Amino acid sequence: MSRSTTHRYVITLVALGYLEQGASRKYRLGLKVTDLGMSALNATGLREHAREDLEELRVRSSYTVNLGVLDGTDVLYVERARSWRRGQDKIDLGLHPGSRLPAYCTSMGKILLANLPEEEQRELIGEMTLTKKGPNTITSKKALRDELDQVLDAGFAVNDQELAADLYSIAAPVRNEAREVVAAVNMAAHSSMISLGELVDALGPHLVSTADRISARLGYRRDDER
């Protein structure tokens, strides 16, 4: 394809909102692409199946609860039950359904990466630039792979100020009928509200139960239920 033809296609995609040009003059995916992805997710029923359970956990815990899926090297936020408790606004980060965050420094991203086939996981990590976001961001790819091994063994993921200072979160996997991990649920809190240990020990079981209920709505059954 000639350069002039490619340029015409790019200009057309920009005009339609599927590409946008940043200050560096490099192109990135536009909001229309996110709209397409959200429409596809709506068609699967994932948001509809999860919404009631997310809201129930928000009420029970008084913390913000999120549902996300892996999209390339990012976590795409699919649904969000936002807490209005004092202090939660400090870690809100302006997130909403359709928002994206790097998978490597989020609890949902880590649980989703940990459950990928090994070769696919290595390819994705190879594409990542592990930029420091918070005080404890993992910036070594080997350290990230080691962390993901621990996450897989534990069955849940923890974010200890890896995305931003004072932000704690924990995440659990959502599985479908084929037993594949297709999404993740997480709960986030400011460090002034609860310790990470309390978040894991006191609220972790409720988070896992919520993820299990959503999984059941998607047709997943544990071995002892088959």
PLM features per residue range, with description:
Residues 1-48, 212-220:
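N-terminal helix-turn-helix
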Residues 3, 10, 33, 54, ...:
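Short amphipathic alpha-helical/adjacent loop interface patches that line ligand
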Residues 12-18, 32, 66, 77, ...:
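Residue-level recognition of specific faces of alpha-helices
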Residues 23, 71, 177-178:
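Short, ordered coil/turn segments that flank beta-strands lining enzyme active or ligand-binding pockets
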Residues 28-127:
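Amphipathic alpha-helical effector-binding/dimerization core
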Residues 120-123, 128-129, 208-226:
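Cysteine/selenocysteine-centered motifs that mediate thiol-based redox chemistry or coordinate metal-sulfur cofactors
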Residues 133-135:
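Intrinsically disordered, low-complexity polar/acidic regions
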Residues 137-213, 226:
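Extended hydrophobic
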